[in-house]
Every structure is written in structure tokens, then in C-alpha cells.
């Protein structure tokens, strides 16, 4: 137990590995999957696909270990960790994705996941209320997964609007976190703005070039798993990605590593989790990602509600 205690006290190395593996599995596995089917010449395509698979497994086992280390703070994380372990063996069941086991398991994950996110908010500061739109976005993804896979009925809503509202809350939370006027905070804001600039130029290029607009509509929504019911909303998606990159970089530079990495995990998996390619990790990851966003908070809302609660 002392080993786990030491690991919990020094979570940063795991967050670094988790951040790197989640980024590269997204780039080489999720994001690479769709451009690779287009009539484009991709050099060393086989190597890139292999790298994607390697980083996917590194990501899986790192997020599994991270969830184990979060159990001390979030008691419901025990059930999410157990669900991750069970998901390893689910494919051993013939036609598991069409079995009552699969449907029951998805409903179970949804109920526990929403409860865990509520626990995460209650065990963090008052500023975490700004993350409620992000919690709502993850909850919608979980409910959308049940609606599609269990009841075979797609949940129609403006996912891009949910994403943008989530971003508004997350950026506000990032700016308010550690309000000390330090050089590090100013550097974080400056670098975040610099990261946003290329996306602004991309928005202009895509908006003024119909061919690029069509190409981006073929790639970006499929990469993220998000449904754009209006193809002209592709520029809004580019804006959302730019603001996401800005907020994540700001969080990491300001020292809130878990929030930056957690939000990246949320946005890169929350919409994929609706269908998830029948891979449960894409349904579970946003839940763990949200818990990571609030992990560094010391003051707790639950202590304000009930001061005796420890």
C-alpha cells in the first residue's frame, strides 16, 4: 500500500505519460484512421498505423493505472476502474456488442459515470461549477451511446453547441485557477493565444475555399466522432479545436497538468464514445478525463455544504 501512496503523491510522471500516449494514439490511431482511406499518398502508412496501435495500448494501461490512483479521492472510481478491466475481456464473449451483457454494461457505466462526475464537482472548489457544461457534454455522450446502441435511436442535438459552451466554462475555469499574478500565468496566456492563431488562419482559409471546406467536412467530424448536421459549421468546429488547444496549453503551463490532460482526453473521446467502434474505453475515458480536471482542487464544495464531511 505504501507504493500506491507514494505514486499518488507523485502523480505527475503518470500524467505526462498519459498525456503523451493520449495525444499520439489520437494522432496516429483516431485522427489517422480517416485520412488514410482518402486517395492520398501517406508515406510510411504501415509504420504510422503500428505506432497508433502501440500508443493506444500504452494509453489504455496508463489510464487504467491512473484511475487506480484516483480511487482514494473518488470512491466511485473503483467501479470505473473495474469496468475498464472488464472491457479487456468483453470481446471474448461471442457477439458481445449485441448481447444483454453489453446493453446492461453500458447503462451501468452511464449511471456510475454521471455519479462520479457529480462526486468530482462536489470534491473540488466552487470554480468547478464552471465545468458543469463539460459534465453535461460528457453525460450527453453517455446517454447518446445508450440511445444508439441499446435503443437503436440516434440522439439528435447540436453537439457543436454543447462543445462550445463546454469550452466557455473550461476557459473561464482555467483563467480563474490560481489567480496569482505570476510570470508563469502570463506566459501561459501568451502561449495559449499564440497556439490559437494558426487555427484562426485555418478558419479563414477553409471559409474562403470550398474545396478545403468539403475536405475538412470529410475528415474532422469523423476524426472526433462529432455529428455536424450543418456542414457550414465546420468553421465553428475549427474554432472549438483552436480554443481547446489554447485552454489546454494554458492549463499545463500554469501548472494544472491534470486539468489540461483531462480536458484533452474529454474532447478527443467524448463523441467517439457515443459509438466507440464498440470499444468501451472511448466511453469510459471522458469520465476519467473529467475527474482529472478537478483533481488538483483542495477546497471542496462538499465542505461548504457539510463542514463535518471529510
Swiss-Prot record:
Main subcellular location of this protein, as a coarse class: membrane
Domain of life: Archaea
Keyword line: Cell membrane, Electron transport, Membrane, Transmembrane, Transmembrane helix, Transport
UniProt-annotated location(s): Cell membrane
A GO CC term assigned to this protein in UniProt: plasma membrane
Membrane topology annotation: Multi-pass membrane protein
Key word 4Fe-4S present: no
Cited InterPro entries: Cyt_b558/566_suB (IPR017573)
TM ranges: 51-71, 76-96, 98-118, 126-146, 156-176, 187-207, 233-253, 264-284
Entry keyword annotation includes Transport: yes
NCBIfam families: sulfolob_CbsB (TIGR03155)
Protein name: Cytochrome b558/566 subunit B
Species, as recorded: Sulfolobus acidocaldarius (strain ATCC 33909 / DSM 639 / JCM 8929 / NBRC 15157 / NCIMB 11770)
Gene name of the record: cbsB
Amino acid at each position: 500500500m505504501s507504493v500506491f501512496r507514494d505514486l499518488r503523491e507523485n502523480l505527475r510522471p503518470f500524467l505526462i505519460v498519459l498525456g503523451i500516449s493520449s495525444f499520439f494514439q489520437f494522432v496516429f490511431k483516431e485522427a489517422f484512421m480517416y485520412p488514410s482511406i482518402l486517395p492520398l499518398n501517406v508515406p510510411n502508412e504501415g509504420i504510422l498505423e503500428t505506432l497508433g496501435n502501440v500508443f493506444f495500448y500504452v494509453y489504455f494501461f496508463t489510464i487504467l493505472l491512473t484511475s487506480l490512483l484516483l480511487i482514494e479521492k473518488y470512491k466511485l472510481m473503483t467501479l470505473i476502474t473495474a469496468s475498464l478491466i472488464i472491457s479487456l475481456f468483453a470481446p471474448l464473449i461471442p457477439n458481445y456488442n449485441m448481447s444483454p451483457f453489453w446493453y446492461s454494461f453500458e447503462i451501468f457505466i452511464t449511471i456510475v459515470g454521471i455519479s462520479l462526475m457529480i462526486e468530482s464537482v462536489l470534491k473540488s472548489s466552487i470554480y468547478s461549477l464552471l465545468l458543469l457544461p463539460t459534465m453535461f457534454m460528457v453525460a450527453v455522450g453517455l446517454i447518446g451511446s445508450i440511445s444508439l446502441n441499446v435503443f437503436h435511436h440516434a440522439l439528435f442535438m447540436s453537439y457543436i453547441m454543447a462543445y462550445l459552451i463546454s469550452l466557455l466554462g473550461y476557459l473561464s475555469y482555467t483563467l480563474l485557477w490560481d489567480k496569482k499574478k505570476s510570470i508563469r500565468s502570463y506566459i501561459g496566456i501568451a502561449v495559449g493565444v499564440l497556439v490559437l492563431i494558426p487555427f484562426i488562419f485555418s478558419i479563414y482559409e477553409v471559409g474562403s475555399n470550398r474545396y478545403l471546406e468539403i475536405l475538412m467536412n470529410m475528415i474532422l467530424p469523423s476524426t472526433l466522432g462529432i455529428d455536424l448536421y450543418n456542414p457550414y459549421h465546420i468553421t465553428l468546429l475549427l474554432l472549438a479545436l483552436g480554443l481547446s488547444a489554447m485552454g489546454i496549453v494554458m492549463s499545463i503551463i500554469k501548472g494544472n497538468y491534470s486539468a489540461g490532460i483531462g480536458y484533452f482526453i474529454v474532447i478527443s473521446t467524448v463523441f467517439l464514445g457515443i459509438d466507440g467502434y464498440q470499444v468501451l474505453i472511448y466511453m469510459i475515458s471522458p469520465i476519467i478525463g473529467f475527474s482529472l480536471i478537478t483533481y488538483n482542487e483542495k477546497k471542496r464544495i462538499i465542505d461548504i455544504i457539510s463542514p463535518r464531511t471529510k
